């Protein structure tokens, strides 16, 4: 038993599918997605944006395919990307057929506008022929007309019924490489819909609060909605939808997972809001560190506390810690133990060098363990 059972999250049991070379569901890590917002026909701009997202750790990227020109550009985009590409399809089912042929790893279809069961069957045939997965993307803003008439408004029962109807369409075609989302911009509606769907099916679930808003408001809304579900063990992949750069969606997605100890990437900073007791400018220091340590992918914890009230206690729980002291000298903790002091003028560069050295040490140890495992085989 864990020594901290109150921190344990038991994930919902789900089937594992493959989206390109990324496993989704089962015991696979919860993957982080985003979506490009460049014109897809501008392949170079789209590829450049994908590269920026890859640099911050994105696992899967969705690309909108509204017309033939976009699916024509998709082939070059898929070839240039290092992560699997998901084609976002609405209204025109033939775009899904073209995207599958262009190398998309997954086809996102919307039950509210993809069309008849015959069209869905054609999409399934294309997916099978090209080794694509499918995401059934139900959205409260584009529910089928008959479901709106039946229920009077978007509600959990309506979203779940839409999802179940389209799951059956895929299963009737003997297709099982699919994941499902039941998104809404209303957190209550989205959470209730996902919880109901999670009880009804065993397929992987793609989490998201759609049209969440700008960077701050959308982050809060997504953290509440997605975080609530993850805390309940629900969710196999996620996308934080923000009116912001896609790279920010990836960062927020990882921060939600980090907060719940479900997946860690990069430096997790514990810092105080600062007050008159601070021995150095905490806000300025943390901002600078977040920028200078953004390239670190290795999971490391770092505490930056302005004074000795909580500083030593937080430092005991992190890999590296700094606590503000008097006369411009600050305590540095390594692995929870007081190690040395550092002066104001040298502190920022010193912390960066400590984190980089710790990351290199961890990666070297990982490589050593991997080599030993390979040798043993």
Swiss-Prot record:
Record-level GO BP terms: isopentenyl diphosphate biosynthetic process, methylerythritol 4-phosphate pathway; terpenoid biosynthetic process
Keyword Transport found: no
Catalytic reactions of this protein: (2E)-4-hydroxy-3-methylbut-2-enyl diphosphate + oxidized [flavodoxin] + H2O + 2 H(+) = 2-C-methyl-D-erythritol 2,4-cyclic diphosphate + reduced [flavodoxin]
Domain of life according to the entry: Bacteria
Keyword 4Fe-4S: yes
Species this chain originates from: Zymomonas mobilis subsp. mobilis (strain ATCC 31821 / ZM4 / CP4)
EC number: 1.17.7.3
Family assignment from sequence similarity: Belongs to the IspG family.
Any GO MF annotation of the entry: 4 iron, 4 sulfur cluster binding
Cofactor note: Binds 1 [4Fe-4S] cluster.
Swiss-Prot/TrEMBL keywords: 4Fe-4S, Iron, Iron-sulfur, Isoprene biosynthesis, Metal-binding, Oxidoreductase
Record pathway: Isoprenoid biosynthesis; isopentenyl diphosphate biosynthesis via DXP pathway; isopentenyl diphosphate from 1-deoxy-D-xylulose 5-phosphate: step 5/6
Cofactor: [4Fe-4S] cluster
Protein name: 4-hydroxy-3-methylbut-2-en-1-yl diphosphate synthase (flavodoxin)
Binding site for [4Fe-4S] cluster: 272, 275, 307, 314
Reported function: Converts 2C-methyl-D-erythritol 2,4-cyclodiphosphate (ME-2,4cPP) into 1-hydroxy-2-methyl-2-(E)-butenyl 4-diphosphate.
Broad EC category: oxidoreductase
């Amino acid at each position: 038993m864990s020594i901290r059972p109150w921190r344990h999250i038991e994930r919902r049991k789900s089937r594992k599918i493959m989206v390109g070379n990324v496993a989704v569901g089962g015991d696979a890590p919860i993957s982080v997605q985003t979506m490009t917002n460049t014109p897809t026909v501008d392949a170079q701009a789209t590829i450049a944006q994908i590269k920026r997202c890859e640099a911050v750790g994105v696992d899967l990227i969705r690309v909108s395919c509204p017309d033939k020109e976009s699916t024509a550009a998709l082939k070059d985009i898929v070839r240039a990307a290092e992560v699997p590409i998901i084609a976002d399809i609405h209204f025109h089912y033939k775009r899904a057929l073209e995207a599958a042929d262009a190398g998309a790893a997954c086809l996102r279809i919307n039950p509210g506008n993809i069309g008849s069961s015959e069209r869905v069957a054609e999409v399934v045939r294309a997916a099978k022929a090209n080794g694509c997965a499918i995401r059934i993307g139900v959205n409260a803003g584009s529910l089928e007309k008959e479901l709106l008439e039946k229920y009077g408004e978007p509600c959990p029962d309506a979203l779940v019924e839409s999802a179940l109807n389209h799951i059956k369409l895929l299963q009737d075609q003997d297709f099982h490489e699919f994941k499902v989302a039941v998104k809404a911009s209303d957190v209550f509606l989205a959470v209730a819909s996902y919880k109901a769907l999670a009880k009804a099916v065993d397929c992987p679930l793609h989490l998201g609060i759609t049209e969440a808003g700008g960077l701050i408001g959308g982050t809060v809304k997504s953290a509440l909605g997605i975080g609530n579900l993850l805390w309940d063990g629900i969710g196999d992949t996620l996308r934080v939808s923000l009116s912001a750069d896609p790279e920010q969606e990836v960062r927020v997605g990882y921060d939600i997972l980090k907060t719940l100890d479900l997946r860690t990437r990069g430096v997790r900073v514990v810092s105080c809001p600062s007050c008159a007791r601070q021995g150095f400018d905490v806000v300025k220091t943390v901002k600078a560190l977040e920028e200078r340590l953004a390239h670190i992918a290795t999971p490391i914890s770092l505490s930056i506390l302005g004074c000795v009230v909580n500083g030593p206690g937080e430092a005991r729980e992190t890999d590296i810690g700094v606590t503000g002291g008097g006369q411009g000298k600050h305590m540095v903790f390594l692995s929870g133990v007081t190690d040395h002091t550092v002066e104001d003028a040298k502190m920022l560069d010193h912390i960066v060098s400590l984190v980089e050295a710790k990351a290199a040490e961890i990666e070297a140890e990982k490589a050593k363990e991997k080599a030993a495992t390979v040798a043993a085989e």
